[in-house]
């Protein structure tokens, strides 16, 4: 697939889009392998390649789009044998195997040179050992979505602190409702709860150190305090019963029907909430409350990325392409509701007129000073994430098993990281 691809989907040639990338005289071949295989992302990727090609008429762009799931097993071979110039992947610890194998290029100098203005809030998610290895192009927020109408009925306000959270929850439980719906049949939802409780209890840096295997599950007092805070909610009946039997979608009717008043979830759930019949007047959003005062707040915002393989042949063109896709105007267009329908990572971008996207953008751009986490099953190595999330689900059902759970997680840590 070459540079003659049409850019009709995004209209990226609109006035004002000709960034500094257009000034570079690029030639040769630029090979891109992308996993943006679903219909809307595919159209975005094809249009990006087409527009970049129009900006650089002497550059031949070869775009290969592969199945998103298949790419997870193919990427190592692609990076090792005849690597392309640009690939899609994910941020944080999902980069680590390819950084450690010297398969992703260190692009710290490009970050330091100012190529990525407006991306400083997520620089940490592209950093390993103080070096940067990629750039982000889209993400979405997590947080607490709640039934505003029920909060109003009960006289509740959005909680800013853990004490306010617990007080609210007691009022909700006393009204005959659960504070939170959740479905842990697929374990990742429990991982989201641990992410937030641990980041709010101990801080983003502690959470990332745990993800890297640097802290003991059994000996670190901060980890135990996280579970103690979680147990406060469990013991007061904050969560719906039998959540281990439900997927996140199957748990949504508790929220829709008013049997539970809130859902800790990613912004992708809003469409399902609206489709269930709830109006925007009935739903609102707040940032997960502060637990330990003074800690900069970290947030879960799973981030998709572009990287330059270490064996790239056209590094100059790859650099310009990364600068292009992270520019504020391009990020605005590719993330709007007609395309990816997510959040631009560039703080200078604009967003669609949607209250939840607006709140998420404001939170991630201006109130996530602690750092951007990628989610439990992305930040922890795959095997550790699997064992860990099994333990987290078990804790939510059988909190008295905590010591046994932590012993298993510690055994896994010693085996997996060492």
Predicted regions located by residue number:
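Extracytoplasmic "Venus flytrap"
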Residues: 29-47, 66-68, 375-380
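Extracytoplasmic "Venus flytrap"/periplasmic binding protein-like
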Residues: 47, 51-119, 127, 149-160, ...
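Hinge/lid segment of periplasmic solute-binding proteins
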Residues: 90-142, 166, 172, 193-195, ...
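Extracytoplasmic/periplasmic solute-binding protein
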Residues: 129, 133-137, 142, 166-215, ...
């Amino acid at each position: 697939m070459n540079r003659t691809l049409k850019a009709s989907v995004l209209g990226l040639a609109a006035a004002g889009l000709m960034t500094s990338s257009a000034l570079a005289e690029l030639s040769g071949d630029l090979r891109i392998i992308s996993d943006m295989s679903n219909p809307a992302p595919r159209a975005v990727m094809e249009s990006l390649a087409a527009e970049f090609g129009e900006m650089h008429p002497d550059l031949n762009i070869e775009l290969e789009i592969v199945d998103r799931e298949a790419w997870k097993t193919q990427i190592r071979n692609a990076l090792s044998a005849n690597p392309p110039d640009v690939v899609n992947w994910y941020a944080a610890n999902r980069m680590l195997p390819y950084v450690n194998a010297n398969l992703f290029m260190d692009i710290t100098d490009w970050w330091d040179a100012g190529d990525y203005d407006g991306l400083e809030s997520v620089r940490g998610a592209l950093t390993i050992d103080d070096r940067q290895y990629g750039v982000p192009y889209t993400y979405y927020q997590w947080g607490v979505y709640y039934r505003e109408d029920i909060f109003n009925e009960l006289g509740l306000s959005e909680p800013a602190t853990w004490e306010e959270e617990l007080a609210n929850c007691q009022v909700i439980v006393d009204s005959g409702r659960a504070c939170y719906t959740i479905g842990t049949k697929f374990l990742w939802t429990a991982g989201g709860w641990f992410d937030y409780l641990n980041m709010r209890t101990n801080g983003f840096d502690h959470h990332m150190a745990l993800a890297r295997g640097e802290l003991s599950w059994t000996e670190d007092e901060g980890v135990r305090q996280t579970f103690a805070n979680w147990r406060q909610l469990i013991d007061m009946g904050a969560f719906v019963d039998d959540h281990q039997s439900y997927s996140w979608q199957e748990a949504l009717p508790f929220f829709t029907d008013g049997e539970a008043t809130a859902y800790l979830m990613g912004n992708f759930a809003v469409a399902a909430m609206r489709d269930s019949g709830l109006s925007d007047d009935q739903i609102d959003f707040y940032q997960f409350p502060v637990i330990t005062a003074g800690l900069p707040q970290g947030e879960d915002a799973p981030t998709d990325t572009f990287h330059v393989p270490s064996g790239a042949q056209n590094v100059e063109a790859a650099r310009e392409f990364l600068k292009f896709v992270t520019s504020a105007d391009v990020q605005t267009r590719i993330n709007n509701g007609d395309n990816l329908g997510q959040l631009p990572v560039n703080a200078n971008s604009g967003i669609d007129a949607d209250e939840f996207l607006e709140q998420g953008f404001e939170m991630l751009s201006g109130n996530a000073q602690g750092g951007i986490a990628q989610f439990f099953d992305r930040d922890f190595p795959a095997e550790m994430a699997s064992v860990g999330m099994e333990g987290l689900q078990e804790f939510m059902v059988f909190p008295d098993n905590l010591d046994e759970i932590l012993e298993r997680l510690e055994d896994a840590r010693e085996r997996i990281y060492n």
